[in-house]
Regions:
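Short internal beta-strands
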Residues: 40-48, 204-210
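Conserved beta-strand segments of alpha/beta enzyme cores
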Residues: 40, 61-64, 112, 203, ...
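Histidine-anchored nucleotide/phosphate-binding helix
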Residues: 23-37, 189-195
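Donor-nucleotide binding loops and adjacent catalytic segments primarily
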Residues: 170-243
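Short gly/ser/thr-rich secondary-structure transition/capping motifs
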Residues: 111-117, 157-163, 230-234
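A nucleotide-sugar donor-handling region in carbohydrate enzymes
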Residues: 125-186, 214-216
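Active-site and donor-binding regions of nucleotide-sugar-utilizing enzymes
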Residues: 9-20, 28-35, 46-60, 64-145, ...
Length: 243
């Protein structure tokens, strides 16, 4: 009987101000982890708030936490301990800061390492780089360190629900507004204030994001315009919301 692989995701995310972080890295890791089952999945998370609860909600239980803003030396130490303790076969890194390249280089000496970066970043000393940045042509190449790179929208990591291209065409709301994982700049109240001017003609659904709290102001607004505006914290099926 073939033994299951042990895969560790190192991600960062949550309610982090002035870091442009949110939950994008976490959701991408979740989408990939769901496709990698029935392997043994572990998460090592630099949690700025709400990440652990989100992972638990998706059914993941092997979650280990790091403090937000952890120093690179401590990050490497804690990751290394976990690699050996859980006998990790593959490390998948989906985080971005100025220390990520140094972190990946160190980890690559210990374990097979995959990096999932953003924008035009590809030069990591790893085994595999997966970058679905829309600005890349779909291609496979080797970077300066000899790592295989899967580039372009073809390799974007999305929830498998998007593989079904059928749409329901049953629109309940005129407008659907989503603010990612975390509304760092508090745009939702401003948006809602303007939206109320047009609720005699439209209906709207707003998805705050798992790391954004539903304030008393928003609850009152939803109650005042019941049937015209619906505000939820999150969804597990964004395709269903937009189709």
């Amino acid at each position: 009987m073939t033994q299951k692989k042990n895969i560790l995701f190192r991600v960062s995310g949550g309610r982090a101000f002035n870091k442009e972080l949110g939950l994008g890295h976490v959701y991408r890791a979740i989408n990939l982890a769901l496709e990698l089952k029935p392997t043994n999945i572990f998460f090592l998370v630099e949690d700025y708030g709400n990440v652990k609860s989100l992972l638990l909600n998706w059914g993941f239980k092997n979650i280990f936490l790091l403090k937000g803003g952890i120093k690179i030396s401590s990050d490497i130490t804690e990751t290394t301990k976990l690699l050996y303790k859980k006998k990790i076969d593959i490390l998948i890194v989906d985080k971005y800061d100025y220390n990520t390249k140094k972190y990946v280089k160190r980890m690559h000496k210990i374990v097979k390492t995959v990096v999932v970066p953003d924008l035009e970043k590809i030069d990591y000393d790893a085994d595999l780089v997966v970058n679905g940045f829309i600005g890349f042509d779909n291609t496979i190449l080797t970077n300066r360190y000899g790592a295989k790179c899967l580039l372009g929208p073809k390799y974007q990591i999305l929830n498998k629900k998007y593989q079904n291209r059928k749409f329901t065409n049953q629109k309940k709301y005129t407008i659907l507004a989503t603010f990612g994982g975390f509304d760092e700049h508090n745009i939702v109240p401003v948006f809602c204030k303007q939206l109320t001017k047009y609720l005699d003609r439209i209906t709207a659904k707003i998805i705050l994001g798992p790391a954004t709290k539903k304030s008393k102001e928003l609850k009152n607004l939803e109650e005042k315009f019941r049937g015209k505006i619906k505000i939820i914290s999150a969804t597990k099926n964004m395709k269903k919301e937009i189709s």
